Amino acid sequence: MSKEVRVRYAPSPTGHLHIGNARTALFNYLYAKHFDGKFIIRTEDTDDKRNVEGGEESQLKYLKWLGLQWDEGADIGGEYGPYRQTERLDIYQEYLNELFAKNLAYKCYMTEDELEAEREEQRQNGQVPKYSGAHRDLTPEQIEQFEAEGRQPSIRFRVPENTTYTFNDLVRGKITFESSDFGDWVIVKKNGIPTYNFAVAIDDHLMKISDVLRGEEHISNTPKQMMIFDAFGWEAPRYGHMTLILNEERKKLSKRDEHILQFIEQYRNLGYLPEAMFNFISLLGWSPVGEEEMFTQAQLIEIFDPERLSTSAAIFDQHKLKWMNNEYIKAADLDRVIDLALPHLIKAGKLSEDMDDETRQWAENVISLYREQLRYGAEIVELTELFFQKEISYDEEAKEVLNGEQVPEVLQVFTDKLIHLESFDKDAIKAQFKATQKETGHRGKKLFMPIRVATTGQMHGPELPFAIELLGRDIILNRLDKLLKEMGA
């Protein structure tokens, strides 16, 4: 790259970190680090009606949780601050004054009702609604009259005539807009706060932003920002617009979509690992060379190539996310898996927060049984249900297993073996399977399936000898005895 790469993620503190925003931040982070550049966080907080208390802190908290580290930002400072737009209002005023001096900005006193009436008339005439320029050249007398009426003006940018705005999008290639597509647009609202496109262009220039990677919904904002760059004689950054994220039904991912969790906080609370989320999100609209999908952050930084950003919409595949998180759980230290899962058993009321050491060790052993199956921490509650239920029931498939003619003999012999065990541990229990097989002559599914169903109520499950040990001698013998009595054995 001919100049230092400087990219920014610019969240608005309007709520929690959304999947789409997390992807924008992550791609900018990978882009910056791949090219040994700088990753900047700039808070765009001028819309006080939409700002949420704690919104900025929440965004930064979950960016950090994902593993992103920034080089400049409101929380750590930097050479090109301040990094909150509400702290830069004097800067915007300075450049607004310059636009007035160049006759590139003017006051517009039209009310919202007047503007809507104008748009409606254009629609009725088959035109695309845009500002007509009605207040483009007001006389001093007209301005005085509007001021006397108490009207508050907005300030509009005077869009140049017969001008073409072209940029080579990093994702989509050449994109062109004509100035005639736009009416004079508002750069400062009636409350004196600069609009998004005006403030962003100034910030991007002053912060020396080299590249802007963002969602495709910003494509139409790009020519407006280019107008501001042109007005001051500045070089615009390179732009790249990522495709939409769709749900599994190929519809745009919406915050109102109840079938997909939308916020990073929700995934953390459910027991997803941050490195799994980082890996998964990195593949939403970008693909590496080859078939491999599992990458560390360091590997992604090394291989990230903006030319491989997809021109097709990304699909948020929940099954793939669960698969990927499971892969990370299987590779994690057991202590970390326990820390991930145990709080969910406590939250569900299965265990007490002040459990004794013996109970905690038992719970850790139970969790270890499901390490290979666990897709996210909260799933441990469902997976381990058999260890917390007092009574077990049998579905039709299980009943069919128990109806086998060999079952009473298998269960009776196995029960007798367990009764006489001195040490009720998995190794000793495992040996009783072999002893039961030797005594009854039954092997394979005819031996193991009846014992599994009788002791756990399930057709499938974790390592059976260890599960039997953890369920405990009393529970297991009671279950076997009850079932044998029902069979008349």
UniProtKB/Swiss-Prot annotation:
Statement: the UniProt record of this protein carries the keyword Aminoacyl-tRNA synthetase: yes
E.C. designation(s): 6.1.1.17
Keywords of the record: Aminoacyl-tRNA synthetase, ATP-binding, Cytoplasm, Ligase, Nucleotide-binding, Protein biosynthesis
Amino acids binding ATP: K255
'KMSKS' region (motif): residue ranges: 252-256
Residue window of motif 'HIGH' region: 11-21
GO BP, one annotated term: glutamyl-tRNA aminoacylation
Assigned GO CC terms: cytosol
Molecular function GO terms recorded: ATP binding; glutamate-tRNA ligase activity; tRNA binding; zinc ion binding
Family: Belongs to the class-I aminoacyl-tRNA synthetase family. Glutamate--tRNA ligase type 1 subfamily.
Job of this protein: Catalyzes the attachment of glutamate to tRNA(Glu) in a two-step reaction: glutamate is first activated by ATP to form Glu-AMP and then transferred to the acceptor end of tRNA(Glu).
Oligomeric form and interacting partners: Monomer.
Protein name: Glutamate--tRNA ligase
Organism classification: Bacteria, Bacillati, Bacillota, Bacilli, Bacillales
Chain's gene name: gltX
